[in-house]
Amino acid sequence: MEGIHHGGHGGARPSQSMAFPGFDADSHMMSDDFTFDSPFSSSGSSNANDGVLGNSIFPEWTNGAPRGESPDEMQRKDPLAAQIWKLYTRTKSQLPNQERMENLTWRMMAMNLKRKEREQQEREQQARASETVSPAPSGIEMRISDQVSSAGPDLSHDMNLDGTSDAMNLDDFIIPFDSPAEHPSHPSADRQFTATPTGSIPIKSRKDAMMEQSTAASFPRAPQDQRTNSEFGYVARRVRKTSVDERQFFAGLSVPTRKRPAEASPQVPPVSNAIVAALGIVSGLPDYSLDHPPSAFALPGNGTVGPRRPQHHHTHSNIPYGLDTYGLNEDHGINSAGPYQQNFHFSPSESPMTAGNPFSRLYTQTPLASSLNSTEFFSPPPSGYQSTVSTPQPIYEGEQSIFFSDAPSAESHSQRRIPNYIQQRQSNLSASLQPRYMYNMNGDSHQGNAVTGPPTTHVSGFSVPQPQHVNPAQVLGHGEFSTTAPATSMFTFGGDSDNEDDDGNFERGRMTMPNDFASMDESGDMSAGLHWDGGFPGSVQSLPGFSAQHRKHVTIGSTDMMDGPPEWNQGGTLGRGHGSVASVSDVRNQNQDPRRYGKVPRTASTPNAAALLRQSLNGSASGPPTNHPSPSTPPESGLSSAVPSRPGSPGGSKNGDPNAGPTTCTNCFTQTTPLWRRNPEGQPLCNACGLFLKLHGVVRPLSLKTDVIKKRNRSSANTLAVGTSRSSKKSSRKNSIQHAPSTSISSRINTSESPPSMTGSNTLGKPGVVPIAAAPPKSGPPAGVAQGRAGVQVAPRRQRRLEKAPIGSDQDPDDSPKSAAPTSRSKVVPLAPAMAPPAAANPANHSIAGGQGASQEWEWLTMSL
């Protein structure tokens, strides 16, 4: 009975009384029955083993294993298991608790098997350790090891058990890949060892090689060798658990993985040139970098004069006209961030997130400054696209543009067709991202709106062909274009300032725009730019020498209209040094008309700025103004037919449009907020939703909506002059230059008791709010009445959205003496310009969206300063 209490290798086992408490009274029967020469230990009991335990839970009973399950061999290996098995096979039909007995038997056998597996693994580890220490086992050592293995439990039997395939091991069925840990080593037969004279294996120092070959994580890996020619080629390669299981490439299996394979990552060379010089793998990479290259779309004149030449950086192509013959659109390995990367091509008046691929060869070369600045350059829509901070965007500086020819040809006289300027936009983008252009739109009220080039000998300007009339008298000529002006940084992301109402020094994220778009030829004809026809009333040129300017000039979504002049860089457009606050010295130093400035408006949700200007343009150029129900849906949006993903918010109330409603938050649809903000798409958000989105990064839930607006306890919160002083003070705190003229006589004032409602009802009456655009002027009282009512009206703060106020007219600059308007650089703006429309009061806000009087007032403002 000693084997029951102390079985195996000296390990304590549960006694018989513990395992079977009901058999204490029959110990003499157990001693008789469990003797190993019992007549019940016949071959019949071992034959019963095959039917009961013939499954794959225990490897001993699988097919292919040597059958040694006689009771004698079981007794030799594990006495307790043998005796319990004999008991069970004999009395399983008479036991009252046979299910419990069977369960207990299985559990005890499983414990024994686990213990044997642990012991076997320990022996294998010791054997491997002895192999690494000794170079080759001699004959004596091999005999000793054989004696040790035979003296202990049957090691060869255990090896054979492990060598068979286990039906419960799923790894054998997924990818048959060998590793040294799965199979025991056979030191005597399987491997050939070459003994060295010194008795040790010469292991080379691989530390230098590892330091030499360490590259960046984004660097493309060479095809992994099968390690057949290396020194340790017999060692199976360790599988590194990365994003892709590399075993499938070795096994030749196409096992789909859930993660993105590493081959779809951008193949960007590392930044350090020392690493690149030591590796021959760089020669297989395409010629691009993540730096800011002078691309083929870069500017010829950073103060230099000369024709534009395509930049041949690395690839010197012999193909004429610089045609793209590689078909990079079909190369899915180059699309660095999946299929969405090809939509980042920048177009003249559209955001980089256009659907389709209209100008891929022309606008691919626009440099996205870096990974961080490109985040400020384009903001992805609220969907699951990738981050530009973590995803590098490759730039093909060596590829040439296929759109324009490099040499003048006979076909260049004819207008080239732009195939499908923009495709249907993706439906997950919201309404503000619809493409809207001043050119290539339905000509309901805009006749002759084809974009044409001047009648030169070789016209590089392109046209969007429309079946409409082209007025040759209104085609812009040579003198309209500047070729020597320096390049200006034109676009900054609107989210880079904390408060949207501050004009600040936005020197951080920028993007450089070219001198002109079209003249790619070598002949020096720099005047054939991207020409807008000045004939149709939606054009900026219908206003004589004037175009609107806005505060931050960001194109995040698509733009409402092209407020820019025909040249994109007329005199530098506006120096970004003062955050789009043009100083008068900048204006005076320009040789061109000082009133011809303009930039792309902010977004489609800059409702009042673009729409009021368009209304005044339509009214001044074509007679009756065309009233639109909302500035967010202008008439130029004829190209866009995508359904918005959520109801579009009505734009800001226009003073001349009776149908326009107040600005509504696109998230909570409120109309009362102390400060209007914008989401990354440019749609208006209330202060609460905007702050919530900026702080938390998610949209503010509607359950948090409340109509109670908490105010700060300011003593003079309702006075207009203090509000304007606060806004100018904040602007001056950001080192921007503000010129606040004290206009006493010729200031435009309101004929109502409340200031005009601006974009999102932003007026100077609100503290810290610089309006975006002014309202179109209407006929008002004469100068005497304006002077008499200049400093009287102080509207209450709550009253500004309740009524739409017409605006007093401009006074002609001939009627207003210059001495009556002294200049003031004070931080506190006086009260009279606070009641005036903000374009006259605050030149930091150059959105003078007026008619003829607006350009005259700008001229007067320039002269007075």
UniProtKB/Swiss-Prot annotation:
Transmembrane segments: none annotated. One of its GO terms (cellular component) is nucleus. Its main location: nucleus. Residues 115-126, 180-189 have a biased composition (Basic and acidic residues). SMART domains: ZnF_GATA (SM00401). Residues 582-592, 715-724, 737-764 have a biased composition (Polar residues). The keyword Magnesium does not apply. GO terms for biological process: negative regulation of transcription by RNA polymerase II; nitrate assimilation; positive regulation of transcription by RNA polymerase II. Pfam families: AreA_N (PF07573), GATA (PF00320), GATA_AreA (PF08550). PROSITE patterns: GATA_ZN_FINGER_1, GATA_ZN_FINGER_2. Gene3D superfamilies: Erythroid Transcription Factor GATA-1, subunit A. InterPro entries: AreA_GATA (IPR013860), AreA_N (IPR011420), Transcription_factor_GATA (IPR039355), Znf_GATA (IPR000679), Znf_NHR/GATA (IPR013088). This is Nitrogen regulatory protein nrfA.
